[in-house]
């Protein structure tokens, strides 16, 4: 059985946590502010620079929510104090990316350039024409934006062309063996 919900979450210095009556948690830090509504089955308290989550009953669904709530709160605390970053690499002849204002222009071997609208709360930098850095305070949003960009041209297993995460390893396949 997982005991993630029983962890005490340390509130970093410079981070302020407010809990409204309807379990609306607002966390403010040096990087920004995040708010999220949590289930009324989980009680959230602040005691001596620690966040404590308690479940109100022992049903299976409530136990699942307990661990999920704890993990989401930890992500919010990390996001407003340190932020999150995902890095993408673009591999392929002529494949490149450029940031123009609030749009990301991708050349991925299609007959047309791909334009990606950068959502609010996320910053995308083209470190090189073949490397992207996606940063923000919302863990879910940063990961979703990275996944959406990667989905335009997933890495293929024969030559490895496409968009991949920086530390991702692509399992390569051997091409067809030549016949007689």
UniProtKB/Swiss-Prot annotation:
Coiled-coil stretches: none
Keyword annotations of the record: Ribonucleoprotein, Ribosomal protein, RNA-binding, rRNA-binding
GO molecular function: rRNA binding; structural constituent of ribosome
SUPFAM superfamilies membership: Ribosomal protein L6
A Pfam family of this chain: Ribosomal_L6
InterPro entries: Ribosomal_uL6-like, Ribosomal_uL6-like_a/b-dom_sf, Ribosomal_uL6_a/b-dom, Ribosomal_uL6_bac-type, Ribosomal_uL6_CS
Function recorded in the entry: This protein binds to the 23S rRNA, and is important in its secondary structure. It is located near the subunit interface in the base of the L7/L12 stalk, and near the tRNA binding site of the peptidyltransferase center.
Family indicated by similarity: Belongs to the universal ribosomal protein uL6 family.
Subunit (UniProt): Part of the 50S ribosomal subunit.
Protein name: Large ribosomal subunit protein uL6
Organism: Mycoplasma capricolum subsp. capricolum (strain California kid / ATCC 27343 / NCTC 10154)
């Amino acid at each position: 059985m997982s005991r993630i919900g029983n962890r005490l979450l340390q509130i970093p210095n410079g981070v302020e946590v407010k809990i409204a009556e309807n379990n609306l948690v607002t966390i403010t830090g040096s990087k920004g502010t995040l708010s999220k509504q949590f289930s009324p089955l989980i009680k959230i308290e602040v005691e001596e620079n620690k966040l404590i989550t308690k479940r109100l009953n022992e049903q299976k669904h409530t136990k699942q929510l307990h661990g999920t709530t704890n993990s989401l709160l930890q992500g919010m605390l990390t996001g407003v104090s340190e932020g999150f970053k995902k890095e993408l690499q673009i591999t392929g002849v002529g494949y490149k990316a450029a940031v123009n204002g609030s749009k990301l222009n991708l050349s991925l071997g299609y007959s047309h350039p791909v334009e990606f609208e950068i959502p609010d709360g996320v910053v995308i930098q083209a470190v090189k024409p073949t490397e992207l850095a996606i940063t923000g305070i919302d863990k879910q949003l940063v990961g979703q934006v990275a996944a959406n960009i990667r989905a335009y041209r997933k890495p293929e297993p024969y030559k490895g062309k496409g968009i991949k995460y920086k530390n991702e390893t692509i399992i390569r396949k051997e091409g067809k063996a030549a016949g007689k």
